[in-house]
């Protein structure tokens, strides 16, 4: 039977990872290693300055752990290299995140980081996120569409094989709409995320300042010379966005011009 490792950044008890397990439990043997507490926006952080403690969850056949103060990357690393080192995983899936992970948000995302860690460890990986609000703001949050999409995607992978080669992963974003409103799937590039750079200053009872970094509204613009629907464009039109991500961040188109610039600097 196929084996799938699940993680997230919303924490072991989050609704999204429960919905993900429920969607896949009849398709594969499911293992879950997730942070004990929410670790949103922790990016690719791994814990190397303090010890990690893994708590085995009772009644889960030894396949569920939560990691005290662990990040999604910690969870995947520990699962593959220690907790379940005897298991050969067919997939790592991170999610279902409560909120989108599109554009440059993928760099901040702990959800995407969980899938990146799976990719680094040599396992085909998927990050999946559920949009919390879009133009249909009165639509109640439901994982029905996300569950259907991940089932279809996993079945396709089990049948045809993983579609990407090398250190690449799939990033999936689910629109906040019903199954009836859903218009299909789009293969998309990342959009250009627009940030507001908000910081909220507060004062505690001792008259000391503290700060909350602002949550940014979902705003974006098209990238230059890009005609495809972006991930943002897809979800606001009730399409599922599927984006291939590459771990290699090298800007190959700039190598030659950078060489010329560097030679000029040395003269």
Swiss-Prot record:
It catalyses: a ribonucleoside 5'-phosphate + H2O = a ribonucleoside + phosphate. A divalent metal cation binds at residues 9-10, 40, 97. Keywords: Cytoplasm, Hydrolase, Metal-binding, Nucleotide-binding. Its cofactor is a divalent metal cation. Disulfide bonds: none annotated. Belongs to the SurE nucleotidase family. This is 5'-nucleotidase SurE. The gene is surE.
């Amino acid at each position: 039977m196929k084996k799938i490792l699940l993680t997230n950044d919303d924490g072991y008890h989050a609704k999204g990872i429960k919905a993900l397990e429920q969607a896949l439990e009849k398709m594969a043997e499911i293992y879950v290693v997730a942070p004990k507490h929410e670790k949103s926006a922790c990016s690719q952080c791994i814990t190397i300055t303090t010890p990690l403690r893994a708590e085995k969850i009772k009644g889960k056949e030894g396949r569920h752990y939560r990691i005290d103060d662990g990040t999604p990357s910690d969870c995947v690393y520990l699962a593959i290299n220690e907790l379940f080192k005897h298991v050969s995983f067919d997939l790592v899936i991170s999610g279902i995140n409560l909120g989108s992970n599109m554009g440059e948000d993928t760099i901040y995302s702990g959800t995407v980081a969980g899938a990146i860690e799976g990719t680094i460890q040599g396992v085909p990986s998927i990050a999946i996120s559920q949009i919390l609000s879009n133009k249909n703001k009165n639509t109640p949050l439901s994982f029905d569409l996300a569950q259907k999409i991940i089932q279809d995607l996993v079945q396709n992978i089990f049948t045809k094989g993983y579609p990407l080669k090398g250190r690449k992963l799939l990033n999936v974003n689910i629109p906040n709409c019903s199954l009836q409103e859903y218009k299909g799937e789009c293969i998309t590039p990342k959009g250009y995320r627009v940030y507001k750079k908000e910081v909220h200053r507060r004062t505690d009872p001792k008259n000391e300042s503290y700060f909350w970094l602002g949550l940014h509204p979902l705003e974006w613009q098209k990238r230059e010379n890009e005609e495809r629907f972006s991930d943002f464009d897809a979800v606001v039109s009730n399409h599922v966005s599927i984006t291939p991500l590459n771990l290699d961040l090298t800007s190959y188109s700039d190598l030659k011009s950078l060489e010329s610039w560097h030679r000029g600097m040395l003269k």
